[in-house]
Amino acid sequence: MDHLHSSTETTTALPELQWLEAPLMTTQEDVLFPLAWEELACRQVGKGAAPILHVWRHPAALVIGHRDRRLPNAPQAMERVRSSGTSVCVRPSGGAAVMLDRGVLNLSLILPNPQRAISLHEDFRLMAGLIADALAPWSAEAQTGEIIGSFCPGDYDVSVRGRKFCGIAQRRQAKAYIITAFVMIEGHGAERAQAVQQFYREAAGDTPAGVQQPDYPRVNPATMGSLAELAGVPSVEAYTASLRRVVESRAAILPADGSLVQLEGLAEQMAALRERYDLQV
């Protein structure tokens, strides 16, 4: 487990960028929408548009990974979640299932990659450093390292006292890429973990004796926590304001380009993502 130091100490520089903070989505909106938007925005960054930090939230969504979708009963489990009024999608980036609500902040750093040379560890450290720096007004205890039993586990889980509040993943395109993170700020981490745990139980189904069980994260709800629980962060708004100050101290914030992604292309992109990652399994 590594203590996090300031993101200014990483070798990956934070460029001048656009801060794009979307309003809280509604329960009727498809959680695939912001992911499709990021796919199109990433292409524009690859063509020379300014880098972006995309900040968004959805009030009730389950976002699963490619491997999750391949579990034997995944379609039925996804439909059960949808029937409860929760939006469900398979995301194009790496990682496993994540439960989203209004207390979870989603961050996506969209950066150019003209030389097609990505340092995965440096970029993950950059995002983890920003997240830890934004937590500094309340706690200096953020650490990175996989939290066994967490949902969406990875080497760059960000935790406080052994309980994970943030996971980081990446999505690559030809000339740009996206570093994504979820940050649990309000609410209870264990409740979100229980919902993910239930999804996996249903998606994996019953395994007959003598048959190897499907491979999926075994979630222990006690390993997850929100920043309200772990560090006394009062609200998503307070943490987001702190993150904005951290970013402003590292980079020039450019005016947001509202015409970067054309709305008419989003429906087509959403359909393409659904076809590739959900239907063709």
Regions found by a protein language model. Give the residues of each.
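Beta-rich nucleic-acid/ligand-interaction surfaces
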Residues: 144-164
